[in-house]
Design a protein with these regions (language model features):
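Outer-membrane beta-barrel initiation region
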Residues: 1-51, 118-137, 365-398, 410-421
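Surface-exposed extracellular loop regions of Gram-negative outer-membrane beta-barrel proteins
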Residues: 11-22, 27-75, 105-109, 127-146, ...
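Asp/Glu-centered strand-loop micro-motifs enriched in Gly/Pro and often flanked by an aromatic residue
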Residues: 1-12, 22-24, 29, 76-77, ...
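Short linear interaction motifs
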Residues: 115-116, 124, 147-148, 281, ...
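Outer-membrane beta-barrel translocator/channel fold
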Residues: 58-94, 102-120, 183-217, 257-261
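Outer-membrane beta-barrel translocator/pore domains, especially the C-terminal barrels
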Residues: 135, 139-140, 159, 163-436
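A short acidic (Asp/Glu
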Residues: 32-37, 67-69, 112-115, 156-158, ...
Length: 436
């Protein structure tokens, strides 16, 4: 791989300030010659619009003469196109009156290109989108007007033409006795399912997920509100709350219009505790004093929805494209699925989100997740903190972290016939500044 300074190659005498432009060439012995370019910029105005802007254009491609090696039983996959590559552009600009303009282009040649040539980006970074958005943040209020289209037909994505979101979070009402949160959205969405692979072996393990089997198109509007009543009972913080939503879909999985009402009432509480002992020291474990901080938490709620969750298409994605790509194979590899069937509800990712109370979040990224429930969530957050650094300049660090939670379901039907489930834990030991 060789990178070239494009400004020098093309003899550009007046290089725009705060910009870099490179060209790249690469020879892949078993695949072919590749070419690419990367242009990065940060300017005070762009497109004749005043305001600080920054962004990047990254393009790379090759005439591919090889095959893809994507893991077990995918060692020799024939690419769907001979010329393969991607064009990726991101732009963000601050306009007048605090309005933020964002634009993005994410064009990919075929379904396996990113997994083969950009595996870290494929696994870890956001999905490539093609669209534009305007956003304005005023104190605790945000409105967001966006439009995007699907340009890669091998991914399941929703075109929004357009979609308007409004958030109003943490607003104090009733003379500071309550707190109000709101999220309202309306848009015209077209859910476009992914096309099947051309490779015969890939096609044999491809089946669309439940809720994305067809093309769905229509208006979706929803408004979700929550009112909290925070109280202090001695050392315990208690927050009774009421949450409600009214949502409308112009096209459900049966191509009918439907209105759903949803209500949730519950109580959240937390009890913080701590103990500090400056005499605990260890050179071996790099400990100089120890503070143990614990927060015990409870979230108990009852919820009721007028419509079942499985009535709605996946207008909002739960997972990134990479995870959806895997889930379609997961159905065959792990569960021996048959094309046309769906994974059991016990393993359906929508049910995991529902049991984890995604619907209890006013700003939930997935409107479709909501159903009847009665759940108790018991959780603890624990920190063991110490001081590190040279004398006189010590700083506090989390030496160990242990978080754990368990969900209890009085009605076992809400949890696949089990009263307990979804036990999660997260333990981290920060041995040193460079190793965890």
């Amino acid at each position: 791989l060789i990178d070239w300074n494009a400004f020098q190659i093309f003899n550009v005498e007046e290089v725009p300030e705060n910009t870099t432009w490179s060209l790249s060439t690469d020879l892949l012995s078993e695949r072919g010659v590749a070419f690419g370019t990367l242009y990065e910029y940060q300017r005070d105005d762009m497109f004749d619009l005043p305001g600080l802007s920054r962004g990047q254009l990254d393009a790379w491609g090759l005439q591919d003469h090889g095959t893809d090696n994507l893991g077990r039983d995918r060692r020799n996959v024939t690419p769907e196109r001979d010329f393969r590559g991607r064009i990726f552009w991101q732009h963000r600009q601050l306009l007048r009156d605090g309005i933020q303009l964002s634009a993005e282009v994410g064009l990919i040649s075929d379904r396996n290109f990113m997994e083969q040539f950009y595996e870290r980006v494929w696994d870890q970074e956001k999905d490539p989108m093609t669209g534009v958005a305007l956003k304005k943040i005023t104190d605790n209020r945000v409105w967001d007007l966006a439009a995007n289209i699907r340009v890669n037909d091998f991914f399941t994505q929703t075109d929004w033409l357009p979609k308007l979101d409004h958030h109003w979070l943490g607003e104090s009402i009733f003379a500071d006795r309550a707190t109000w949160h709101e999220h309202t959205s309306v848009g015209f969405g077209t859910l476009k399912p992914a096309t099947a692979p051309l490779d015969v072996a890939e096609q044999a393990k491809f089946d669309l997920l439940a809720g994305e089997e067809q093309k769905y198109s229509g208006i979706r509007a929803a408004s979700r509100q929550e009112i909290d009543f925070p109280m202090q009972w001695g050392n315990v913080k208690v927050v009774p709350y009421l949450l409600g939503e009214v949502a409308y879909w112009g096209d459900d999985i049966s191509h009918q219009s439907v209105t759903r009402t949803y209500g949730q009432v519950g109580i959240r509480s937390s009890l913080p505790m701590s103990r500090t002992d400056a005499n605990i020291k260890s050179k071996l474990f790099n400990v100089s004093g120890l503070a143990h901080k614990v927060n015990w938490m409870l979230d108990a709620y009852w919820a009721d929805a007028s419509e079942n969750m499985d009535r709605f298409p996946r207008y909002d994605a739960l997972d990134d494209d990479a995870q959806e790509h895997y889930r379609r194979r997961f159905f065959f590899d792990t569960f021996g699925g048959i094309a046309g069937q769906n994974i059991a509800s016990k393993w359906d990712e929508r049910m995991f989100a529902y049991r984890a109370n995604m619907q209890g979040n006013v700003s939930s990224p997935v409107t479709e997740i909501a159903d009847d429930a009665m759940t108790f969530r018991l959780a603890t957050e624990q920190r063991w903190q110490t001081k590190r650094g040279i004398a006189g300049k010590q700083h506090v660090v989390d030496w160990m972290v242990l978080n754990a939670e368990i969900l209890l379901f009085p009605d076992a039907d809400n949890n696949e016939g089990q009263h307990t489930g979804m036990f999660d834990y997260d333990y981290r030991w920060h041995v040193g500044d460079r190793f965890t």
